């Protein structure tokens, strides 16, 4: 039965990929791959049209938290780890087809978003691997493993964030930030409007009631300069005047059981978000950046079951909340670089944040400073944050303070 469900899902995605491939190769093929890549890198010219480019980037963190270690778990913890450590091969195959392959090692990390784990966690995988076909500016196709076209901050370049990192609380359940599938997207009305429709794997566990693609849609309206690539920047460092309003939704039928042991209580997954991004250079003084988003993730109350699917609860499970952030880039350099102070505020409510911890609310408040020596290609960051739990009756939900430092390099 499990094999049949997986086979049906695989056939559905395969059919979409076949249709995509037919369109691509009948029409000549795609679009320059867009990602959070640095300028420069090693470029290999293949012919007058085709080329391949190699980039390397990393973010090395030094982190401190005032809890998590010692016999009682109440002593301070220090941790050095690669938040991101990437080798990327991208390029253009024809005037209509481009591609990207991204390998990443992350870790070994002990300080997690709301806890300090006993054993450091690291991972090495193919983070992204997809092709982009451009039939016109209004009709483009992505196929492969790519960023999930849902939350704006997930779609923002990982090496162009305003704050040190994106929110810890906005990831999609099961697949988090990347998923495998297809996306139809494009720009309309001189790139004032962008749309994205996607069908991706979503939940793949044998414990799911159904095996169905996760369907998604996203649209944005750019009122000033366009944001017309598959993805955004967390800050354009004063090179654009941007005011963009976006919204997105996801749906996956039969994504989770409320009781996985008895395989009862079929629950659908739905989520929606709305976001706003504003960046404006103020003459020769500097650049103001403001951004925020609301997110609601719903598994139709799966957490109330006796043995809910793990993906329907916890950090990425059923929740609602929002974040807001603001920054200011000083135009004049101090020493070899520019400074960019920022602040960030988030409020979240979880159905079940940890086992038995229901309706927990948390507030995340942080601020920091970026020192941009060579734009985003050489950046030093410092961030101080406080995570405040509304209910501290559980020993696992005590307020804590975190200090992160970051060295970011890209070439």
Over which residues does each language-model region extend?
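Outer membrane beta-barrel
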Residues: 34-67, 72-227, 233-234, 318-333, ...
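Low-complexity, intrinsically disordered short segments enriched for Gly/Pro and polybasic residues
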Residues: 1-2, 15, 34, 196, ...
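Sec/Tat signal peptide C-region and signal peptidase I cleavage site
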Residues: 25-32
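Outer-membrane beta-barrel pore domains
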Residues: 35, 47, 66-67, 71-74, ...
